[in-house]
Amino acid sequence: MVLGGCPVSYLLLCGQAALLLGNLLLLHCVSRSHSQNATAEPELTSAGAAQPEGPGGAASWEYGDPHSPVILCSYLPDEFIECEDPVDHVGNATASQELGYGCLKFGGQAYSDVEHTSVQCHALDGIECASPRTFLRENKPCIKYTGHYFITTLLYSFFLGCFGVDRFCLGHTGTAVGKLLTLGGLGIWWFVDLILLITGGLMPSDGSNWCTVY
């Protein structure tokens, strides 16, 4: 069929091509406008404040609205933060008072014997929370672990205690040499150290606690 000197099929084909080209141009304009809006305008918080970038690419929010889903970084659970080791003041009470936190001594057998202090913590990268991202987390025990295991030390004391191996491992070098020279105090010192280990009277010399075996 011919319409105005042109076949109808040719006109339909030209119309479809024009519609396809128009759709492509429209999609290109929409996607370009969306990408410009996403990069040019900063995301706003629920309170209307801009959201700057924090360290590690994490968003640093300002806490203002108590009904906002964004919480303070200091309220994050332990699995979302990383904390430093407690500060060791090595018995210097003046330094502890000036800093406001830290441990004068480490270790202890009972809960009441262990000091507790605050430590510096920060939110992990990628976790969105209201600043400040670095804060103090309280009630951390003054305990450290340096690789001493109770079972291993007890076996050393039982089988090699006459040669002072148990005290050498715990860092009590002076008494270990005396125990070695006297062959465990003719067996008396060997037996006494076994009792001290079991009752908690003989611990590592650096004030650390026994490592826990899970």
Curated annotation (Swiss-Prot):
Main location: membrane
Spans annotated as Disordered: 40-59
Membrane-traversing stretches: 145-165, 183-203
Glycosylation sites per record: N37, N92
Sorted UniProt keywords: Glycoprotein, Membrane, Signal, Transmembrane, Transmembrane helix
Signal peptide: 1-35
Domain TM2: from-to ranges: 147-195
Pfam family, one: TM2
Coiled-coil regions listed in the entry: none
Topological domains annotated Extracellular: 36-144, 204-214
DNA damage in keyword set: no
Intervals, Cytoplasmic compartment: 166-182
Tissue-by-tissue expression: Widely expressed.
Keyword Phosphoprotein: no
Origin superkingdom: Eukaryota
Location of the protein in the cell: Membrane
Cellular-component GO terms for this entry: membrane
Bilayer disposition of the protein: Multi-pass membrane protein
InterPro entries linked to this entry: TM2, TM2D1-3-like
Family that this chain belongs to: Belongs to the TM2 family.
Protein name: TM2 domain-containing protein 2
Species annotation: Homo sapiens
GN (gene name): TM2D2
